């Protein structure tokens, strides 16, 4: 991990193309802008290849996709692989319906995703491991989270992030844990979507994908902790969101270094 990538993003301003979940584009766009990236979103298939060519990374959020949108998703993924741009998948609620499961497995079969970011329930579904999921929530599974994440990374030969109270991140060999957190982050609908897109931004500047995933996790969670501290940990999610964007825009490598709590599972 190289925390100087926090400053590098602000210098490079990588363009991140997002196939966005219609629930959260405001948060994702503003969060990406805050960390120093340049977000762009589109629902037009005819411009997909051109957008990917100018992009530094592509993020696919499968949370609210209609079959009519499959050609656009396919074109974005195809172009990302063709032009060797980092490609991130957020398989929102993949275990909730057969439709969502089929869509995500189709994408993973046809294209190589450098990173998959989901909650532990979503990651377990993709890995083929039983877990009690509940909609977009992780559910109450009792398995070994590090083993689930590692198995998924090995299956798809990429980096996998299971975000939650503790973030588990694996490249199939090692499992890194990030223990920074605040109860206010999950109170913001789309905080996971934002993390997926921030991973895309760091993938554009980091030396390797695992470093990008760990740094992105640390940046969002440490910014969240700093934002919550300004509210004295009160349950004020609306105010927290404003402070979170401020912290994402101003957090420094040194501040993350001082706050970070990482380990290996």
Curated annotation (Swiss-Prot):
GO terms for molecular function: ATP binding; ATP-dependent NAD(P)H-hydrate dehydratase activity; hydroxyethylthiazole kinase activity; magnesium ion binding. It comes from the Bacteria. The lineage of its organism: Bacteria, Bacillati, Bacillota, Bacilli, Lactobacillales. This is Hydroxyethylthiazole kinase. Pathway: Cofactor biosynthesis; thiamine diphosphate biosynthesis; 4-methyl-5-(2-phosphoethyl)-thiazole from 5-(2-hydroxyethyl)-4-methylthiazole: step 1/1. Its EC number is 2.7.1.50. Belongs to the Thz kinase family. Substrate binds at residues 41, 190. HAMAP family: Thz_kinase. It catalyses: 5-(2-hydroxyethyl)-4-methylthiazole + ATP = 4-methyl-5-(2-phosphooxyethyl)-thiazole + ADP + H(+). The keyword Transferase applies. The keyword Membrane does not apply. CDD domains: THZ_kinase. Its cofactor is Mg(2+). GO terms for biological process: metabolite repair; thiamine biosynthetic process; thiamine diphosphate biosynthetic process. ATP binds at residues 117, 163. Keywords: ATP-binding, Kinase, Magnesium, Metal-binding, Nucleotide-binding, Thiamine biosynthesis, Transferase. InterPro entries: Hyethyz_kinase, Ribokinase-like. Catalyzes the phosphorylation of the hydroxyl group of 4-methyl-5-beta-hydroxyethylthiazole (THZ). SUPFAM superfamilies: Ribokinase-like (SSF53613). It comes from Pediococcus pentosaceus (strain ATCC 25745 / CCUG 21536 / LMG 10740 / 183-1w).
């Amino acid at each position: 991990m190289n925390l100087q990538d926090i400053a590098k993003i602000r210098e490079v301003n990588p363009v991140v193309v997002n196939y966005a979940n219609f629930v959260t584009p405001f948060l994702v766009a503003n969060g990406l802008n805050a960390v120093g990236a340049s977000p762009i979103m589109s629902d037009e298939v005819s411009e997909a290849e051109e957008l990917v060519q100018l992009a530094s990374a592509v993020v696919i959020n499968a949370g609210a996709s209609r079959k009519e949108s499959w050609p656009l998703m396919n074109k974005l993924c195809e172009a990302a692989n063709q032009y060797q741009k980092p490609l991130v998948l957020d398989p929102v609620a993949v275990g909730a319906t057969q439709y969502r499961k089929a869509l995500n497995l189709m994408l993973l079969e046809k294209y190589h995703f450098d990173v998959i970011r989901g909650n532990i329930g979503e990651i377990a579904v993709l890995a083929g491991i039983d877990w009690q999921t509940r909609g977009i929530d992780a559910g109450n599974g009792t398995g070994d989270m590090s083993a689930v994440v590692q198995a998924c990374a090995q299956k798809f030969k990429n980096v996998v992030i299971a975000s939650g109270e503790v973030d588990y991140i694996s490249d199939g060999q090692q499992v890194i844990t990030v223990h920074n957190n605040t109860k206010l982050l999950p109170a913001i609908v789309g905080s996971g979507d934002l993390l997926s897109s921030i991973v895309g931004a760091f993938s554009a500047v980091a030396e390797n994908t695992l470093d990008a995933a760990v740094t992105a996790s640390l940046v969002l969670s440490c910014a969240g902790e700093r934002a919550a501290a300004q509210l004295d940990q009160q349950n004020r999610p609306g105010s927290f969101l404003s402070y979170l964007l401020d912290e994402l825009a101003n957090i420094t490598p040194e501040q993350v270094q001082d706050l970070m709590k990482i380990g290996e599972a």
